[in-house]
């Protein structure tokens, strides 16, 4: 039921159907509500928390994943190489926990969300999740006073937290879908919102003027049940694999595998899907290949021939220089 509805929604948002016209009046109402809410924050009718350290928001204006996680990993690498010690906060989408607490590499994805667990495993940084990002940020800085910067994974629309930089990630293949706001389309805010942000990063596809291109580079496969074991991707060229993806745009993953020469039988799932062993009845003893985000949720019941494909982001060095220069100016103001 959930998967069917999710796929139906995507067809409406990224296609051209009559449902868009029916839902459009609700989108106009949604626009009025979000415009009034943002105005209230600008007029300081609603309070925003100003932290003692710089805050970088990495978000999007679309519903669903656009590639924020690999970007955050890249951003952490750039910052660490230049002397910064960031902490990360997240809403923890897909997790059941209602409390604010720290995520560790052994945290359960079903409790804290799949992306936070993956980020901790890949970066080793302190990361706190919570329904209120302001509270998560406070807890993080209290427990890790050595952190001198906060990265908010998502949270572009969370105006209760003041920010020093906003970076938006866009799916370069699907862009804005039909261009409509929720519920007629996939947009949380109108595309004009991009005029106010500091940088726009396109995950694949040619970037628009002034934007930055992010390319996702596949690495050696790792075994889901024993990530220390590796296998070169070229060992599977020409072989049939069951490809599993519960991400914002599963077709991107499937297409990437096909371009690499694999014979792909695709199994798309909704973003943040909570996998069970029953989801893999199709697999039998065949090879299963999934994303790293999916793998963190399948370790408990993974079979011997299940593998995941880590990816790393490559982005124009000019963006890193822009971010670092902005942070330098911010720190000079504090002195």
Curated annotation (Swiss-Prot):
GO function terms (MF aspect): ATP binding; tetraacyldisaccharide 4'-kinase activity
InterPro entries: LpxK, P-loop_NTPase
Pfam short name (any one): LpxK
Enzyme Commission code(s) on record: 2.7.1.130
Residue runs in coiled coils: none
Pathway in which this enzyme or protein is active: Glycolipid biosynthesis; lipid IV(A) biosynthesis; lipid IV(A) from (3R)-3-hydroxytetradecanoyl-[acyl-carrier-protein] and UDP-N-acetyl-alpha-D-glucosamine: step 6/6
GO cellular component labels: plasma membrane
The keyword Lipid metabolism belongs to this UniProt entry's keyword annotation: yes
Keyword terms: ATP-binding, Kinase, Lipid A biosynthesis, Lipid biosynthesis, Lipid metabolism, Nucleotide-binding, Transferase
Residues binding ATP, per UniProt: 62-69
Catalytic reactions on record: a lipid A disaccharide + ATP = a lipid IVA + ADP + H(+)
Top-level lineage group: Bacteria
Transmembrane segments annotated in the record for this chain: none
Example GO BP: lipopolysaccharide core region biosynthetic process
Family from the record: Belongs to the LpxK family.
PANTHER family membership: TETRAACYLDISACCHARIDE 4'-KINASE (PTHR42724), TETRAACYLDISACCHARIDE 4'-KINASE, MITOCHONDRIAL-RELATED (PTHR42724:SF1)
Function: Transfers the gamma-phosphate of ATP to the 4'-position of a tetraacyldisaccharide 1-phosphate intermediate (termed DS-1-P) to form tetraacyldisaccharide 1,4'-bis-phosphate (lipid IVA).
Protein's recorded name: Tetraacyldisaccharide 4'-kinase
Organism of origin: Methylobacillus flagellatus (strain ATCC 51484 / DSM 6875 / VKM B-1610 / KT)
